[in-house]
A protein has these predicted regions:
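Acidic/histidine-enriched, glycine/proline-rich intrinsically disordered or flexible terminal extensions
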Residues: 97, 106-115
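Accessory recognition modules or surfaces
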Residues: 3-8, 12-14, 47-48, 53-66
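An amphipathic, aromatic/His-enriched active-site/gating alpha helix that lines ligand/cofactor pockets
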Residues: 2-3, 22-43, 51, 63-104
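Basic/polar N-terminal segments that are highly enriched at the extreme N-terminus
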Residues: 1-5, 114-115
Length: 115
């Protein structure tokens, strides 16, 4: 549900060379469930169609009740022992992500309402 304080977080992950498949698998098998556990609502996930981004980029949007909730959600996610274990195991052969970009967004008054 969208409220006046609802924020959307656009996140762009730039995978380490050759690691996009492993990053997508981590999201598919673990990360989405952990996001839900920590109050982060997944809106959608994309991979670019064209190079050079096609081979190393994951883009997604999360919904949070507020900026404050987003900060608390990320803290609880990062402190979660299950996430720490998944993260460590998934990076046993090297880090999966080179760079993460995060931008918080607010819906405009003329935007179609999102779920």
């Amino acid at each position: 549900m969208h409220t006046a304080t609802t924020v959307y977080e656009l996140r762009v992950y730039h995978a380490a060379p050759g690691k996009l498949g492993e990053l997508l698998a981590r999201f598919r098998e673990h990360t989405l469930k952990l996001f839900e556990k920590h109050g982060m609502k997944s809106v959608a996930y994309w991979t670019p169609v064209d190079e050079p981004e096609k081979s190393d980029t994951l883009i997604y949007i999360l919904q949070h009740p507020s900026r404050e909730a987003a900060a608390a959600n990320w803290k609880s996610f990062q402190d979660d022992p299950e996430w720490k274990s998944v993260h460590e195991k998934s990076e046993a052969n090297g880090k999966l992500v080179d760079k993460i970009e995060s931008t918080f967004l607010a819906l405009t008054d003329f935007s179609p309402r999102l779920p």
